[in-house]
C-alpha cells in the first residue's frame, strides 16, 4: 500500500499501487506531497478466506415491497441465500426486519461492499435504500451473518421497541429526501450538521431560472399545472446538475442554485447546456394544452470564493455566502437583457480549458446592480432566448381539456381533514409568556424558550379529552447512571399516574425515546414540561396522532439498553442509535409543513398541492454587497448567523413560517388573517438591527453597521412538493413571491424600513392602519405601497453606506496603526515582510500613484520571505492558503522566473500574491496570465514589480479585464530593464500596445547613459 501525504500532513490518501498514486498527485497538482510505502498485515480473519487490508461498515434502511410475505419461512429462505453468498465473498453483518422496514449492516473491504451494495440496491424486494452510516472500521462486530431469528418478533416482545423502531424508521425514511445534500452527507459521517463550522471554498456558482415562471403563475388558466411544471424543472435540474459533479444548494421560486468545485468548471457548462436540451426535448413531447411546453431555462455562471455554512434557529439551512453569489445572480439577470440562455463571467473563462475557450464569444462589459465596476461576460453561439417570446406563448396557451398530473386545488375547497398543515395552529395559551425585560430587549437570548408544538389538523377538533399518542426523541445532557434512571422512573411514574397517562421510556446510548398515551390536554401539558427538563436537550417530536386505544398498561415502562432484551441482540442497540441520533437534526432542515404532516402519521408524498392566499414577508441586509466584498468570509457568516437567529425567532414568535434562507435574505409567510402579526414581526426585525448597531457601537465589529429592509405583500401562492424520491422540495411559489422582493428593494427608495402593499392595510387593526402607516410616493407594478410611520422606522441608505465605508476605513486605519506600533517598538524590526494589514492603506509618504512611489526604508525585502508573507496574508484574511502558490513562491526565491499562470483560484488571492512577489527582487520573468488582473488592481501589481530591478518580461495575457496601459508605462519608467509585456487576450487596443513597446525601446536607450544604481531600490 502507498500513502500520499500533503499539506504538511493535513491531507492523507491511500493507494494500492504506485502508478495510481502518481496519477492522482499529478492530476491534483500536488507539489508538496510525499509518498510512503507500507506493508499491512491483516488483523481480521473472520468473514472471508481472502486477506483483507482495510474494512468498512455500511448500514442502510429500506422498505419492503411485499411486507405481507415477510413471515418466518420467507426470511429463512432469504437468510440461507444471504449466508452462502456473503460467506463466499467475505462479508459479515446482520439483517433485521421490522415491518415494513429492513435494517442491514454489512462489513467488508471497499471492493466487496461496493459490489454487494450495488446488487442490494437493485433488489426488487425492497425500495428506498437510505444509507445511515458508511465509514471505515477497525474490526468486525459480527463474525458471522446474523440472519437467523432476525424478525423483530423473535428478538423482543416489548411493544416499546417495536413501536419506536417503526416510528423512527418511518419518519427517517420520509424526511431523508427533503434534506440538503450537505446535511445528509454529514449525517452519514456521524456528525451533527447543526454543529458544523463554516467551510470556505472556491466554487463555480450558477443560478438557473425558469423563464417567465411568474407569468405562468399569474395566468389564471395555468395555475392548475404549476405543480407539474415545478416537478419537471426540479427533476431536470437535479439530473443534470448532480450528474456533472455539482450539488444543488437550494430551490427558490422557479430558481435553482447549484455549485461545482473549481476543477469541474467545464462539466458545469456541459451540464447546463444539456439541461437546456433536455427541456427542449420535453417541450417537443407535450400534448396540446400542456404548460410543460413552456419550460425554458436561463443560466448565469460565476466563479469565486464562497462560504458554505449552516445558519438558522429552529429552521436552519445550508447556504452559500459571498460576493460571488450575488454576482452570479446579477449575471443571470443580465442574460435576460442579452437574450442568451447561458452567460458566464470572465472569472469562469479563466478556469476553462483552451478548447472550450475557443468556442466562447465575448458579450462585452456590462454594469450590474451592486457592483461599482462593470462585469466582463461571455456566451456560447446558441439560439437566442427572448423572454417576450416566451411570455407571448404563455398568454396564447389554451389548456382546453388537458388535465394536470398533480392538479393544484384551492385550499379552502378542501375538507379540514384533507388540508395540508401549512399554518401554525399552535394554541397560544400553551406558549410561555415573556417577561417585561425580555419584551423590552430583543437582544436577550431566548434559546431557552419552548419550541411551539405544532398540532396536526386532524387533532384540532378532538377536544382536550381525545386519546392521543406522542413519541419524542432527545439527548441526555450528561451521562446517565442507574441511580439517575431510577430517579426518573420513580418521579415520572407518580406524575403520569396522577394525569391518567401511560407509556414507555427507552434509554439507549445517551438517547431518550419516550411514548406518552392519554388525554390530549394532559399529554400536551406534560410534553411542554418535559421539554424544559435540564437533564436532556434537542427534544424533537417524532409522532403525534389520535389513538384508538392504549398500548401500555403502566404509567411508565422504563427500559434500558443494557437489559437482557438488547444484550441478546447487540445490533439492535447500534441500530436505534444510528436512527435516533440523526433524527434530532432532521426536523431543523425539513419544511415545517412536511414535519407536521409526518408527525400526524401521514405519508408526506400524499400532500395535496394547494393554492392559498398568504401574507408574504421578505427581508435582507441593506447594502450587503459593499459590506461583504471588503469583509472576510468568516465575518460575512458571523453577520448572517446573527441576523438569521433573530429574524427566524421573530417570525416564529408571531406565528409565521420560514420558507427559505437565501444568502442574506429570509422569506416567510403568514396566514391571511395574520397581517398584524406580520407587521409586528417586521418591527421586531428592524428593532433588532438597530439594537445590534448600538451594542457594537464602540467596537470595530462588522455587525455594527447592519441595517435591513422588510417588505410585506399579500397574494396567492402555490404550495406543492416537487421532485423525485432522490431529492424532494416543498415549494412555495406565486407571482407575489417575485413581487415581494421588489417591495424589499422599494424600502431603499422610499426611505422606510418596512413597506407593505395595497391589499394589506385593509387587513390591519384599525389603530395600526389609521396611525401607523403613511403612503409611499413609489409603488410596485402599479400597486400602491405604504411605509411604517415613525422615526425609528426610517431607512437612510446614504447614511448606511457612509457607515459601511467608514467602518472599513476605520478598521484599515486601526490595522495600519497596529503595524506601525509593531515597527517602531524598541528592539523590534519591521513586521514580516512589512505587510500592511489593509492593502488599501498606505504608510505616510506613499500614494497610489506609481510615478511618485518611493521605497519605504523600514520595508525589508528578502526573497525567502515571499512564501511566509503569502501565508500570513491569507491567514489574516481568514482564507485557506493555496499550497501550489506557496510552493511556487518558495522555488522562485532561488530562481529568476516565477510562473503563476492560471494558478490563482480567485481574485481574493491576488492581494496576498502581490504582497509576496514584492520580495522576489531577483526575478527576471513573471507570468501572471489568466489570473484575474484588471484595471482596478494592475496598479498594485505594478507597484509589487518595481523592486524587481532585473525584471525583463511580464506576462499579463488572457486577462480581458485589462483595458489601460498607464500603470504599465509607470513600470517602464522605474524599471529600465523591462523589454516585453505579453498582452494577448487583453482588451488593450493594438495601437496602445505599440506605443507601449516604443516607450520600452526609448527607455532602454535613455537608460544606457544613466549612472549605475539609479533604480529606486538601490541605496
From Swiss-Prot:
It is found in: Cell projection, Cilium, Flagellum. SMART domains: BLUF. Residues 825-839 have a biased composition (Low complexity). It comes from the Eukaryota. GO terms for biological process: cyclic nucleotide biosynthetic process. Residues 825-862 are annotated as: Disordered. Residues 204-332, 615-744 form the Guanylate cyclase domain. GO terms for cellular component: motile cilium. Keywords: Cell projection, Cilium, Flagellum, Repeat. Belongs to the adenylyl cyclase class-4/guanylyl cyclase family. This is Photoactivated adenylate cyclase subunit alpha-like protein FB. It comes from Euglena gracilis. The lineage of its organism: Eukaryota, Discoba, Euglenozoa, Euglenida, Spirocuta. The gene is pacA.
Amino acid at each position: 500500500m502507498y500513502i500520499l501525504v500533503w499539506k504538511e500532513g493535513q491531507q492523507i490518501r491511500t493507494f494500492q499501487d504506485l502508478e495510481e498514486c502518481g496519477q492522482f498527485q499529478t492530476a491534483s497538482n500536488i507539489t508538496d506531497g510525499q509518498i510512503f510505502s507500507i506493508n499491512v498485515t491483516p488483523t481480521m480473519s473472520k468473514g472471508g478466506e481472502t486477506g483483507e487490508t482495510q474494512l468498512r461498515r455500511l448500514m442502510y434502511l429500506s422498505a419492503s415491497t411485499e411486507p405481507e410475505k415477510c413471515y418466518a419461512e420467507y426470511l429463512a429462505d432469504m437468510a440461507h441465500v444471504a449466508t452462502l453468498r456473503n460467506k463466499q465473498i467475505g462479508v459479515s453483518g446482520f439483517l433485521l426486519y421490522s415491518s415494513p422496514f429492513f435494517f442491514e449492516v454489512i462489513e467488508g473491504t471497499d471492493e466487496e461492499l461496493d459490489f454487494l451494495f450495488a446488487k442490494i440496491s437493485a433488489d426488487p424486494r425492497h425500495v428506498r435504500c437510505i444509507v445511515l452510516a458508511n465509514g471505515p472500521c477497525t474490526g468486525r462486530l459480527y463474525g458471522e451473518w446474523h440472519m437467523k431469528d432476525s424478525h423483530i418478533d423473535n428478538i423482543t416482545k416489548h411493544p416499546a421497541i417495536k413501536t419506536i423502531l417503526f416510528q423512527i424508521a418511518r419518519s427517517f425514511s420520509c424526511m431523508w429526501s427533503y434534506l440538503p445534500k450537505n446535511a445528509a452527507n454529514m449525517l452519514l459521517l456521524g456528525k451533527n450538521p447543526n454543529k458544523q463550522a463554516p467551510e470556505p471554498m472556491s466554487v463555480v456558482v450558477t443560478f438557473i431560472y425558469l423563464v417567465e415562471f411568474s407569468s405562468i403563475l399569474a395566468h389564471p388558466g395555468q395555475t392548475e399545472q404549476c405543480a407539474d411544471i415545478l416537478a419537471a424543472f426540479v427533476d431536470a435540474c437535479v439530473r443534470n446538475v448532480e450528474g456533472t459533479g455539482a450539488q444543488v444548494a437550494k430551490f427558490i421560486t422557479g430558481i435553482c442554485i447549484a455549485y461545482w468545485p473549481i476543477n469541474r468548471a467545464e462539466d458545469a457548462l456541459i451540464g447546463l447546456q444539456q439541461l437546456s436540451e433536455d427541456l427542449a426535448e420535453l417541450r417537443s413531447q407535450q400534448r396540446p394544452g400542456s404548460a410543460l411546453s413552456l419550460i425554458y431555462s436561463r443560466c448565469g455562471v460565476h466563479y469565486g470564493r464562497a462560504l458554505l455554512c449552516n445558519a438558522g434557529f429552529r429552521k436552519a439551512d445550508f447556504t452559500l455566502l459571498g460576493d460571488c453569489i450575488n454576482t452570479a445572480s446579477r449575471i443571470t439577470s443580465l442574460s435576460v437583457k442579452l437574450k442568451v440562455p447561458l452567460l458566464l463571467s470572465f472569472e469562469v473563462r479563466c478556469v476553462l480549458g483552451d478548447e472550450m475557450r475557443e468556442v466562447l464569444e465575448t458579450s462585452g462589459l456590462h454594469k450590474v446592480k451592486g457592483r461599482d465596476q462593470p462585469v466582463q461576460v461571455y456566451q456560447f453561439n446558441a439560439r437566442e432566448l427572448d423572454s417576450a417570446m416566451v411570455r407571448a406563448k404563455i398568454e396564447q396557451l389554451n389548456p382546453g381539456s388537458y388535465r394536470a398530473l398533480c392538479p393544484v386545488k384551492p385550499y379552502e375547497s378542501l375538507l379540514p381533514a384533507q388540508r395540508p398543515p401549512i399554518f401554525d395552529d399552535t394554541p397560544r395559551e400553551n406558549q410561555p409568556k415573556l417577561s417585561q425585560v425580555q419584551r423590552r430587549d430583543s437582544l436577550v437570548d431566548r434559546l431557552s424558550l419552548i419550541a411551539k408544538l405544532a398540532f396536526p389538523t386532524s387533532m384540532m377538533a378532538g377536544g382536550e379529552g381525545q386519546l392521543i399518542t406522542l413519541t419524542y426523541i432527545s439527548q441526555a445532557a450528561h451521562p446517565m447512571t442507574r441511580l439517575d434512571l431510577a430517579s426518573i422512573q420513580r418521579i415520572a411514574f407518580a406524575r403520569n399516574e396522577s394525569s391518567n397517562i401511560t407509556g414507555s421510556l427507552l434509554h439507549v446510548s445517551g438517547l431518550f425515546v419516550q411514548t406518552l398515551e392519554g388525554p390530549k390536554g394532559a399529554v400536551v401539558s406534560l410534553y411542554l414540561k418535559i421539554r424544559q427538563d435540564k437533564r436532556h436537550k434537542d427534544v424533537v417530536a417524532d409522532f403525534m396522532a389520535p389513538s384508538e386505544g392504549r398500548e401500555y398498561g403502566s404509567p411508565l415502562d422504563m427500559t434500558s439498553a443494557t437489559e437482557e432484551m438488547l444484550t441478546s441482540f447487540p445490533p439492535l442497540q447500534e441500530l436505534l442509535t444510528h436512527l435516533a441520533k440523526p433524527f434530532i437534526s432532521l426536523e431543523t432542515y425539513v419544511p415545517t409543513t412536511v414535519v407536521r404532516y409526518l408527525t400526524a402519521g401521514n405519508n408526506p408524498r400524499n400532500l395535496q398541492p394547494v393554492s392559498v392566499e398568504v401574507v408574504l414577508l421578505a427581508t435582507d441586509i441593506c447594502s450587503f454587497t459593499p459590506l461583504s466584498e471588503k469583509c472576510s468570509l468568516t465575518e460575512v457568516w458571523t453577520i448572517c448567523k446573527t441576523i438569521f437567529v433573530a429574524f427566524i425567532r421573530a417570525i416564529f414568535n408571531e406565528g409565521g413560517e420560514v420558507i427559505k434562507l437565501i444568502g442574506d435574505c429570509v422569506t416567510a409567510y403568514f396566514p391571511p388573517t395574520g397581517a398584524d402579526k406580520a407587521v409586528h414581526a417586521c418591527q421586531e426585525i428592524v428593532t433588532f438591527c438597530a439594537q445590534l448597531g448600538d451594542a457594537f457601537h464602540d467596537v470595530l465589529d462588522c455587525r455594527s453597521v447592519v441595517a435591513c429592509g422588510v417588505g410585506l405583500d399579500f397574494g396567492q401562492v402555490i404550495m406543492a412538493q416537487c421532485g423525485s424520491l432522490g431529492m424532494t422540495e416543498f415549494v412555495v411559489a406565486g407571482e407575489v413571491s417575485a413581487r415581494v422582493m421588489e417591495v424589499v428593494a422599494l424600502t431603499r427608495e422610499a426611505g422606510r424600513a418596512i413597506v407593505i402593499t395595497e391589499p394589506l392595510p385593509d387587513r390591519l387593526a384599525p389603530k395600526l392602519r389609521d396611525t401607523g402607516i403613511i403612503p409611499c410616493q413609489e409603488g410596485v407594478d402599479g400597486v400602491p405601497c405604504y411605509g411604517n410611520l415613525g422615526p425609528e422606522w426610517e431607512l437612510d441608505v446614504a447614511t448606511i453606506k457612509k457607515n459601511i465605508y467608514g467602518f472599513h476605513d476605520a478598521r484599515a486605519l486601526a490595522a495600519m496603526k497596529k503595524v506601525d506600533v509593531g515597527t517602531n517598538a524598541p528592539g523590534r524590526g519591521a513586521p514580516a515582510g512589512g505587510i500592511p494589514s489593509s492593502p488599501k492603506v498606505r504608510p505616510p509618504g506613499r500614494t497610489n500613484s506609481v510615478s511618485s512611489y518611493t521605497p519605504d526604508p523600514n520595508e525589508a525585502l528578502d526573497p525567502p520571505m515571499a512564501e511566509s508573507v503569502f501565508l500570513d496574508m491569507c491567514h489574516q484574511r481568514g482564507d485557506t492558503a493555496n499550497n501550489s502558490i506557496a510552493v511556487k513562491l518558495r522555488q522562485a526565491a532561488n530562481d529568476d522566473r516565477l510562473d503563476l499562470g492560471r494558478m490563482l483560484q480567485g481574485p481574493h488571492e491576488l492581494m496576498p500574491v502581490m504582497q509576496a512577489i514584492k520580495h522576489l527582487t531577483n526575478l527576471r520573468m513573471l507570468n501572471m496570465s489568466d489570473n484575474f488582473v484588471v484595471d482596478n488592481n494592475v496598479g498594485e501589481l505594478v507597484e509589487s514589480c518595481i523592486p524587481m530591478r532585473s525584471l525583463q518580461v511580464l506576462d499579463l495575457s488572457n486577462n480581458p479585464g485589462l483595458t489601460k496601459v498607464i500603470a504599465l508605462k509607470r513600470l517602464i519608467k522605474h524599471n529600465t530593464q523591462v523589454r516585453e509585456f505579453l498582452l494577448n487576450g487583453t482588451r488593450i487596443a493594438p495601437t496602445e500596445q505599440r506605443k507601449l513597446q516604443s516607450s520600452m525601446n526609448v527607455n532602454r536607450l535613455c537608460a544606457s547613459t544613466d549612472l549605475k544604481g539609479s533604480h529606486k531600490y538601490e541605496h
